Amino acid sequence: MNNLSFSELCCLFCCPPCPGKIASKLAFLPPDPTYTLMCDESGSRWTLHLSERADWQYSSREKDAIECFMTRTSKGNRIACMFVRCSPNAKYTLLFSHGNAVDLGQMSSFYIGLGSRINCNIFSYDYSGYGASSGKPSEKNLYADIDAAWVALRTRYGIRPENVIIYGQSIGTVPSVDLAARYESAAVILHSPLTSGMRVAFPDTKKTYCFDAFPNIDKISKITSPVLIIHGTEDEVIDFSHGLALFERCQRPVEPLWVEGAGHNDVELYGQYLERLKRFVSQELVNL
């Protein structure tokens, strides 16, 4: 305890193990579902129905390229999964874990746009308690959810680990880092990542306590795949320093993308975002 800073002591003794700041910044915020999944009589085919709030930006032909289904996690929840076929000759599939305030319906248009531009298919899923997924969101469920998605991606579609890019955005970097620390893949992309919950709420925190949540900082060094980190320099939710700290701990970091002036929710609106992803997928991975 002698090495604790004053602010850390305050955290420990004045704010018990689940500080309000962590909840306010990192709480799960599932929106009202923006889609439904309807199963046919055979029980094997699911149809995606999007609400107006999903803000679908493409035609029905593009929507036909989206396959949805349900799978069960080790915690007993049924989670919704989405496979977006963006390119017939795609070498890689992104296993995409989205942020904390959206669901698959809201992300579907983005997935089509992203995948078609970087020549990748995209597989995503909703966390427990999000969209059509059952259960409640929690850290333990995050890990069980991505494990179920990983198994479904490999068994249902026969996609090998060397053709999977694990992509996490914001809270989605938590299950992504956990999975990538246990399984090798083609690469890992961390978009606006956090080091840990306590470090977001209390920036002066220097170590990981037993009650800390989402300890990416302690897991990232176990990732043996190439890691690309993307972070906005003006991120108002997860400070830019988190991306830097994770980059410094990577075994196999590639050139990061620090988006000058970008915040937490607008990195993808900057031109260099797509440019960096294209270069990473089409050029750098070939030589790694």
From Swiss-Prot:
Q: Which GO terms describe its molecular function?
A: palmitoyl-(protein) hydrolase activity
Which reaction(s) are listed as its catalytic activity?
S-hexadecanoyl-L-cysteinyl-[protein] + H2O = L-cysteinyl-[protein] + hexadecanoate + H(+)
UniProt keyword Hydrolase present = yes
In Swiss-Prot or TrEMBL terms, this protein is called: Alpha/beta hydrolase domain-containing protein 17B
| Annotated S-S bridges | none
Q: Which EC class is the enzyme in?
A: hydrolase
Say yes or no: keyword Hydrolase present.
Answer: yes
